[in-house]
């Protein structure tokens, strides 16, 4: 369900699913600005509970704490209202509550997961795409990194894309989450696992994000651009489910896990550099993406089109004032050995990359953003 005031469709979902009890996941920031008010109002027709103390990019212990708090109480529906962290936690709860396995079991083998409770995702950013994906990310503090749990049963049952939820989103959040969404579509399109279906969604998402991210960032009142960004992010999530992200996301995980750099920002710092490294392995695909996004572009050669996309990525990061260096976050050259080792362990994503990355390659990319 998509469009202004589409949040009202939540009433129909509750009726259709014969819901008597609801568990709502959100965070204090979302509640503080009133984005959960309408959801709470609608939920008052049944029994409901709100969990609003989720941390950004939650660790295993954070998710376990929430699961333990809920205990054996049965709920008919889980609603996630927030950004990627909130939606990921909601999706994890939907497969763990009432199950005979734990989160740590899933970290070892996510294939055992089964959907226990239906879900509704209501994103309040325009970037993560978690509302459409079959995966959830948790931080592993002892490894100073992150891990994804992947199973198709985590694909949300319902999604509500209401532009009112991002109408007052700060520009810096639009920028970071928007570039994250852009990374999703570009990585999925250049992934080894790309399919015709993922290509369709990646190209459509790319068109929406490339053409609207600056508008949404620069003009707080441009709800049309923001709505297009939400839809582009959703398409990126669908593309991930059919294809998968690659080295940008793989190398960003240690940056979030150890230095707590926001996910979208860490992706943005790496994005153009990884694509430049990848170029000779995917320039045909980048050229195809360029044709889809900029059909009137005067450049003709495959190399020029690939270069144009990579430059546009770098320009968007610059134009939306996202940091471009890890130095701003206290990352030092002495940290390179850790980053190289931690990044190389993200094999779930690195196997999707169009080029194999050696330890020296990973070191080269990290050094570029120091």
Regions found by a protein language model. Name each.
Residues 258-335:
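Gly/Pro-rich interdomain helix-loop hinge
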Residues 135-243, 354:
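Carboxylate- and glycine-rich phosphate/diphosphate-binding segment that chelates Mg2+/Mn2+
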Residues 61-68, 72-164:
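Glycine/threonine-rich beta-strand-loop-alpha-helix active-site module
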Residues 127, 234-267, 347-349:
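Glycine-rich phosphate/pyrophosphate-binding beta-alpha loops
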Residues 7-10, 32-35, 60, 85-90, ...:
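Short glycine/serine/threonine-rich phosphate/pyrophosphate-binding segments
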Residues 333-370:
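Short, amphipathic C-terminal "tail helix"
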Residues 1-77, 326-327:
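ATP/NTP phosphate-donor binding region
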């Amino acid at each position: 369900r998509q469009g202004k005031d589409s949040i009202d469709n939540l009433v129909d979902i509750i009726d259709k699913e014969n819901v008597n009890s609801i568990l709502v996941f959100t965070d204090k920031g979302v509640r503080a600005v009133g984005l959960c008010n309408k959801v709470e109002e609608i939920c008052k027709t049944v029994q409901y509970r709100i969990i609003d103390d989720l941390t950004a990019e939650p660790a295993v212990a954070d998710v376990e704490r929430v699961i333990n708090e809920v205990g054996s109480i049965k709920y008919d529906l889980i609603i996630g209202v927030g950004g990627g962290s909130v939606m990921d936690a909601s999706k994890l709860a939907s497969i763990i509550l009432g199950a005979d396995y734990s989160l740590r079991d899933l970290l070892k083998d996510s294939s055992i997961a089964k959907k226990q409770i239906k879900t509704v995702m209501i994103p309040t950013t325009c970037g993560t795409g978690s509302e459409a994906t079959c995966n959830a990310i948790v931080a592993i503090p002892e490894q100073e990194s992150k891990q994804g749990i992947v199973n198709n049963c985590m694909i949300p049952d319902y999604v509500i894309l209401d532009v009112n939820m991002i109408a007052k989103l700060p520009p810096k959040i639009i920028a970071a989450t928007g570039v994250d969404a852009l990374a999703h579509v570009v990585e999925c399109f250049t992934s080894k696992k790309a399919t015709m279906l993922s290509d369709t969604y990646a190209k459509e998402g790319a068109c929406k994000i490339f053409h609207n991210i600056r508008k949404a960032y620069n003009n707080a009142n441009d709800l049309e651009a923001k709505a297009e960004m939400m839809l582009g992010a959703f398409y990126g999530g669908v593309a991930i489910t059919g294809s998968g992200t690659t080295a940008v996301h793989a190398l960003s995980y240690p940056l979030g896990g150890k230095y707590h750099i926001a996910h979208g920002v860490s992706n943005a710092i790496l994005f153009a550099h990884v694509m430049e490294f990848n170029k000779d392995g995917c320039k045909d695909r980048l050229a195809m993406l360029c044709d889809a996004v900029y059909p009137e572009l005067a450049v003709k050669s495959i190399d020029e089109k690939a270069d144009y996309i990579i430059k546009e990525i770098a320009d968007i990061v610059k134009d939306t004032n996202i940091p471009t260096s890890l130095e701003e976050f206290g990352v030092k050259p002495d940290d390179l050995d850790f980053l190289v080792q931690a990044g190389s362990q993200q094999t779930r994503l690195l196997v999707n990359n169009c080029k194999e990355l050696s330890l020296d390659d990973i070191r080269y990319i990290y050094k570029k953003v120091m």
